[in-house]
A protein has these predicted regions:
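Eukaryotic scaffold repeat domains enriched in small/polar residues
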Residues: 1-127
Length: 127
């Protein structure tokens, strides 16, 4: 659906596209500045109940969700899956996410804490 159900995070790229995480639709919806729906990134079973969206230094879309544990799913801006990470730490429900300059992810949680996750992406090994 091109309509927003429960928007809760937003980021804009340098191509005048607006990326909005939609908690109830389990995805990020992309619109242009005129409000025209362009595409969807993620979906149920991939990005369950997203709490936020960001763009990292590589221009990739990071979608944070906290269905079961904290999950971070990384996509190209076209919507191709790059990688998916799952926290091994069980913590309280998170309500917001932000990216730091070094690529770390900061979560604000229901238990009045901030959680900082650092991740390293390893390039694929060529044959």
């Amino acid at each position: 659906s091109k309509h927003l159900e429960f928007p809760n995070g937003v980021v804009v790229n340098d191509k005048q596209e607006i990326f909005i995480s939609d908690n109830r639709a389990h995805c990020v919806k992309v619109f242009n500045y005129e409000g025209t729906f362009l595409r969807q990134i993620g979906g149920e079973g991939i990005t369950n109940y997203p709490i936020g969206v960001g763009i990292n230094a590589n221009g990739e879309i990071l979608i944070a969700d906290n269905h079961n544990n904290f999950n971070l799913t990384i996509f190209t801006q076209d919507g191709q899956l790059v990688s998916a990470l799952e926290s091994k730490v069980k913590h309280a429900q998170c309500f917001d996410v932000a990216l730091m300059d070094d690529g770390s992810v900061v979560l604000a949680s229901k238990d009045y804490r901030l959680y900082i996750y650092r991740y390293v992406q390893v390039p694929p090994i060529g044959l």
